Amino acid sequence: MKTKVAAIYGKRDVRLREFELPEITDNELLVSVISDSVCLSTGKAALLGSEHKRVPDDLENHPVITGHECAGVIVEVGKNLTGKYKKGQRFVLQPAMGLPSGYSAGYSYEYFGGNATYMIIPEIAINLGCVLPYHGSYFAAASLAEPMCCIIGAYHANYHTTQYVYEHRMGVKPGGNIALLACAGPMGIGAIDYAINGGIQPSRVVVVDIDDKRLAQVQKLLPVDLAASKGIELVYVNTKGMSDPVQTLRALTGDVGFDDIFVYAAVPAVVEMADELLAEDGCLNFFAGPTDKNFKVPFNFYNVHYNSTHVVGTSGGSTDDMKEAIALSATGQLQPSFMVTHIGGLDAVPDTVLNLPDIPGGKKLIYNGVTMPLTAIADFAEKGKTDPLFKELARLVEETHGIWNEQAEKYLLAQFGVDIGEAAQ
């Protein structure tokens, strides 16, 4: 099977590549990858090349396919797997294999990654339960289950303690104060959505950022009134220019501090502020992944000793987290499409991956069977004045107030003749 992929060839070197895939073995799957949402971690891998923990050497001869937030359709089933999978079945990939090497789809394999028209899912990923049946029909939601799974996993990874009781109570504190720092970006939107609609029931959620435009957008998507209807106080704060942001934020809790803090940017000042905002037994989750292996900040160990403050770090999520993300999206409790601001085809991947930090907006969603420059959803109407494809896409997203949706996805895929398979039984 001939495939077209976006692959890392070295530091800051991402190219389109077209080649013939080898025949699958009896324990492998050949799949068509319909959609892949671009992760900032992919950009980090492209920036570092083989210096990245998950990226192997010899990229020049064996370039690795980018992308891991993906979903698609099974095209061919190895003969030993016919009792478990079938041709035409839709799937979602859970890329976190937990291997000692750190290797995973989108970083480490020549034939296994989400930015591909076709890829081979290897035996090890299948044995680890990484191929999940998808019962839905909206591939964007399936792709976005992976970033939502990471967000959900972070909430589950936080923990709290009782003095002299040597057990960790996993999860955020019920009825507690949550602070989401640097959290008005695409992943932050998902984090706010889960805090309000995921059933974890904090009493207060404070969203902190320094970008008025991003804060205004997320407030439209997840308004204060929506949270209030669920018994949650939601507060949006721009700390830019504040003389004492720590005092201002602590005042929102009556100077008690925050029980759970999530840091969504690897910026030393943000991490230091998080430390100062912790309540007694407060848990700081360093969600943002730094590229600097020597990323260090001062930390108050007096509070660690006397106030039981503590730190966790999370990267990725479990299969159960993925299943939770899919289920909550299917019922409409979570709206992962809120995160999407740009749509593009496979041809847009190299530039998108290499320039991701400089492209404004939220998640960039790629459809591998489509040829289309990366385009902001907000620009569809203008482009539609001269292009009938964008004219219809603009009409379809207007029905959901500018949010990407299943009807727009189906129309786009149909225009390029993409086979979308059938829902898993």
Spans of features found by a protein language model:
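Helix-to-beta-strand junctions that scaffold the AdoMet/dcAdoMet cofactor pocket
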Residues: 278-280
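C-terminal hydrophobic helical "lid"/dimerization subdomain
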Residues: 162, 220, 243-248, 256, ...
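Rossmann-fold NAD(P)-binding glycine/threonine-rich loop
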Residues: 269-272, 276, 288-308
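NAD(P)H dinucleotide-binding glycine-rich loop of Rossmann-like/cofactor-binding domains
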Residues: 95-177
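Short N-terminal strand-loop motif that marks the start
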Residues: 1-66, 400-425
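Adenosine-nucleotide cofactor-binding segment
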Residues: 175-177, 181, 192-270, 393
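Hydrophobic/small residue at the entry helix of a nucleotide-binding pocket
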Residues: 186-187, 214
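Glycine-rich beta-strand-centered segment in the early N-terminal region that forms part
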Residues: 22-37, 51-100, 113, 132
